């Protein structure tokens, strides 16, 4: 079965992510561990953690994915911001391990005036420090593919390969975001473009290291370098790009997570649209 789900709210109590996932008929879910646009960290009670584990077992929703705060910038040249980001990631990863969350997705950082090579080095050094403080046994640390706006690092397979290289023995991997890669210049909505991107991933990162797919259409044109998500089939990617991913013999084994605009019942509608694109037999490569 192809697992399709959405990003859900974790407000009030973390265990409620499973209630919210069940309400929309999600097979898998993603959520924030704390407010993504605030440095404030909310400590979770033992009771809340126990409820989280209990509801996960009861609902059968799996895999479970946490997304990092948007404030973190592991590439920053500002030592205060970078240290704050490192400590924030450590805190979030420790909670992921405690709750046995499967995947932790992060936007690695922005160069903001640095050369790309310097920004990449800063990210690698930051992650080394993080892994010296947190040993990942249950959770995979996933770099998200990014659109390339405002100096984002992680927009190409080459950049992601550099970020992955020092951590081959760790629980690391990649989360592919369809909107981001399309906006970054990978034309995944035609056959040649999709298989070219698939081949690049395979050679430079290894398909086995791709763990999650963020399923988002794009409000902006191809190669726009802008991160603007749209409902499935209503953006410039169109249905074809999602059909390629959902029916690919490898990608269809992964969780597909919607991060489309949160209006009315659109998570339900978007999941239905994705499910209609699934064929019985995968397309072999």
Curated annotation (Swiss-Prot):
Protein residues bound to Zn(2+) 1: 67, 107, 144
Catalytic activity: Endonucleolytic cleavage to 5'-phosphooligonucleotide end-products
Keywords: DNA damage, DNA repair, Endonuclease, Hydrolase, Metal-binding, Nuclease, Zinc
Signal peptide: none
Cofactor comment text: Binds 3 Zn(2+) ions.
Gene Ontology terms: biological process: base-excision repair
TM ranges: none
Binding annotation for Zn(2+) 2: 144, 177, 214, 259
Residues reported in the UniProt entry to bind Zn(2+) 3: 180, 227, 229
GO molecular function annotation: deoxyribonuclease IV (phage-T4-induced) activity; DNA binding; DNA-(apurinic or apyrimidinic site) endonuclease activity; phosphoric diester hydrolase activity; zinc ion binding
Coiled-coil zones: none
Entry EC no(s): 3.1.21.2
Cofactor: Zn(2+)
A Pfam family assignment: AP_endonuc_2
Database matches in PANTHER family: APURINIC-APYRIMIDINIC ENDONUCLEASE, ENDONUCLEASE IV ENDODEOXYRIBONUCLEASE IV
Family, per entry: Belongs to the AP endonuclease 2 family.
NCBIfam families recorded: nfo
Protein's job: Endonuclease IV plays a role in DNA repair. It cleaves phosphodiester bonds at apurinic or apyrimidinic (AP) sites, generating a 3'-hydroxyl group and a 5'-terminal sugar phosphate.
Protein name: Probable endonuclease 4
Organism: Persephonella marina (strain DSM 14350 / EX-H1)
């Amino acid at each position: 079965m192809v697992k399709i789900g959405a990003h859900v709210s974790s407000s009030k109590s973390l265990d409620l992510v499973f209630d919210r996932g069940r309400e929309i008929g999600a097979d898998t879910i993603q959520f924030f561990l704390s407010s993504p646009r605030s440095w404030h960290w909310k400590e979770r009670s033992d009771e809340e953690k126990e409820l989280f584990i209990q509801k996960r077992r009861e609902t059968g929703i799996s895999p479970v994915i946490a997304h990092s705060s948007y404030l973190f910038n592991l590439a920053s040249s500002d030592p205060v911001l970078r240290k704050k980001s490192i400590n924030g990631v450590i805190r979030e990863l420790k909670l992921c391990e405690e709750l046995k969350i499967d995947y932790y997705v992060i936007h690695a950082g922005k160069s903001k005036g640095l050369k790309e090579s310097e920004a990449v080095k800063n990210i690698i050094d930051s992650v080394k420090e993080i892994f010296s403080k947190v040993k990942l046994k249950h959770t995979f640390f996933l770099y998200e593919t990014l659109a390339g706006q405002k100096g984002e690092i992680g927009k190409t397979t080459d950049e992601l390969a550099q970020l992955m290289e020092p951590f081959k023995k760790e629980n690391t991997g990649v989360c592919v975001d369809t909107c981001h890669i399309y906006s970054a210049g990978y034309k995944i909505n035609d056959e040649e473009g999709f298989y070219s991107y698939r081949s690049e991933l395979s050679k430079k990162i290894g398909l086995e290291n791709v763990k999650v797919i963020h399923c988002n259409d794009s409000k902006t044109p191809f190669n726009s370098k802008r991160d603007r998500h749209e409902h499935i089939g209503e953006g410039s990617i169109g249905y074809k790009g999602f059909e390629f991913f959902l029916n690919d013999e490898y990608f269809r084994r992964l969780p597909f997570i919607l991060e489309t605009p949160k209006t009315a019942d659109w998570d339900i509608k978007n999941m239905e649209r994705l499910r209609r694109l699934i064929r019985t037999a995968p397309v072999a490569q």
